[in-house]
Every structure is written in C-alpha cells, then in structure tokens.
C-alpha cells in the first residue's frame, strides 16, 4: 500500500532554518507529501501555511516542546491549528519528567489536559517515544501505562520505530499492538547497538564522552530495520501517514541527501 510520506523537518533543520521555502520546495521535488514541524524558524503561522499551500505540502503535524504546551496549551497549540496541522506531538521528555521519576504521573495528567485542548482546536495529540519509555513499572512498559491512562480520543500514538527497536521490542509487532490508535508512524533507520550517550546523537543532551558503541542513524532502508515487514504492519495497524526522521546525517551525505535517499527507498518498496 502506498502511504503519504512526510518528513520531520528536524531532519533538515539547518537548511530549513536558512531557507524554509527553498527547503520545502526541494522536499516536494524529492516526493515528500507533507512536513512535520519542529519549530517555525521565525516565520508566522500564516507564512508557513502559505508556503505549504504554494508548494503543495501537507502540514500534517508538529513536535511541540512538552513544557511549552503545559505552560500555555491554547496559545501554543493555536499556532499549529492556524497552519492547518491535523496532529501535534509531545516529542521528548527531559530527564526530570521521565518514567521512573516522581514527576512521571504529573506528565500523564498534563498529557490528558493537552489532549483536551488539542481536541478543542480540531487537532489530535500524539506521543512520540524514545527508548526510555520502555522502562517497566510494575511489570508494564511506561509507554503502555501512558496509553492506558489517557483516553484514545485525547491521545494517539506516534511510534518511533527506531526507538522501539532500541527499547528491545520488535517494531512491526509493537506497531500492531496499537492497531487503530496509530495514525502516524515514524520511520527511522540505524546501525549499531545502544550507546550510553544516545541523546548526544539526537542533538539534545551534550556530554563529554564519546558513544561507547557504533550507533549511527541512517537513511531509511540503509540500516538494520526490516522496512518491507514494517510497511505491511503499517497497513494492518491502520496508519494514515508515514513520517521519515533522521536525527543526524550519515554515510558522508548531507541531511538533504539523506532525505532524498530515504524517500527513494520508500518508493522502491511501494510506499
């Protein structure tokens, strides 16, 4: 089955921050159907909406910092409603809010609140996982506890299949677990094993030590993920959008070249 394919703009953030319109135009030429935002790079919602309309890209979703949505949910989310986003996502939890800390129950309550505000504005809240949500609490993954605790009409999944794999689960099987609750899925490829310094690789936490293993993000189709099987699971799970994400470029390629390789590979397997 052919799915519309978007790209998480964080993957090409340097180019987008310098020239969003030109970058979006090149992404459209590569065959991308939509974009998922990670900031607006100084543009107004109206300007971004007009860019997408002019180029023919669907502004499908946005990653919005958790704490920003907690502090001013309606004000922050309204910007993305004005752009035309169907979804907004909690992209990442800093250490003090993660599973296993005293503040994780607070996160669950806030996610319910944010989901209600998003629904009021005509959008659906998603949660984008990393590997740390695969911590078990009383025998259950924290990620599963989150989805059990928040009603489906207030929260849907945005499973990042790289991090599902790193977290110790089979990406296809875990995606199928959320059949009917997985409108958007992140396709991300990688090689190597889990590093003690994973989050330096996604540009969020900087530490002095180098990664202890040769973990590297790759263009989709150029790593260890089984995407033909994942694509079948994507269809069975009822997903409606595939989103490509590559946190850091690799293989000696630029971020835009990596984006092009990912899209070309997905076309080659019928997506």
Give the predicted meaning of each segment:
Residues 36, 61, 89, 126, ...:
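Conserved beta-strand positions in the central sheet of alpha/beta enzyme cores
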Residues 241-268:
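C-terminal/domain-terminus segments
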Residues 12-18, 34-47, 64-72, 95-99, ...:
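Acidic-and-aromatic substrate-binding clefts and catalytic sites of carbohydrate-active enzymes
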Residues 25, 34, 66-157, 177, ...:
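Active-site acidic/histidine proton-transfer and metal-coordination neighborhood
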Residues 1-87, 156, 232, 260-271:
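N-terminal pre-domain/capping segments
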Residues 222-235:
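A short, acidic, amphipathic alpha-helical segment used as a generic capping/interface helix at domain edges
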Residues 120-224:
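Acidic/histidine-rich catalytic cores of soluble enzymes
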């Amino acid at each position: 089955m052919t799915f519309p394919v978007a790209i998480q703009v964080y993957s090409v953030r340097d180019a987008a921050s310098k020239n969003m319109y030109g970058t979006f135009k090149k992404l459209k030429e590569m065959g991308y159907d939509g974009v998922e935002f990670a900031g607006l790079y100084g543009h107004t919602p109206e300007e971004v909406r007009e860019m997408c309309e002019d180029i023919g890209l669907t502004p499908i979703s946005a990653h919005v910092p958790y704490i920003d949505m907690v502090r001013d949910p309606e004000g922050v989310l309204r910007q993305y409603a004005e752009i035309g986003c169907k979804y907004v996502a909690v992209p990442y939890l800093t250490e003090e809010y993660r599973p296993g800390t005293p503040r994780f129950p607070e996160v669950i309550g806030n996610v319910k609140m944010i989901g209600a505000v998003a629904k009021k504005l005509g959008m659906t809240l998603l949660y984008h996982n990393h590997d740390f949500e695969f911590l078990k609490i009383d025998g259950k993954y924290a990620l599963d506890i989150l989805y059990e605790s928040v009603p489906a009409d207030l929260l849907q999944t945005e499973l990042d299949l790289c991090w599902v794999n790193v977290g110790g689960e089979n990406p296809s099987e875990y995606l199928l677990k959320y059949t009917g609750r997985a409108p958007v899925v992140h396709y991300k490829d990688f090689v190597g094993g889990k590093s003690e310094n994973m989050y330096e690789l996604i540009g969020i936490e900087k530490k002095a030590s180098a990664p202890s293993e040769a973990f590297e993000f790759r263009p989709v189709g150029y790593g260890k993920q089984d995407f033909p099987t994942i694509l079948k699971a994507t269809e069975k799970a009822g997903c409606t959008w595939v989103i490509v994400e590559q946190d850091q470029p690799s293989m000696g390629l630029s971020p835009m070249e990596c984006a092009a390789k990912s899209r070309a590979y997905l076309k080659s397997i019928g997506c």
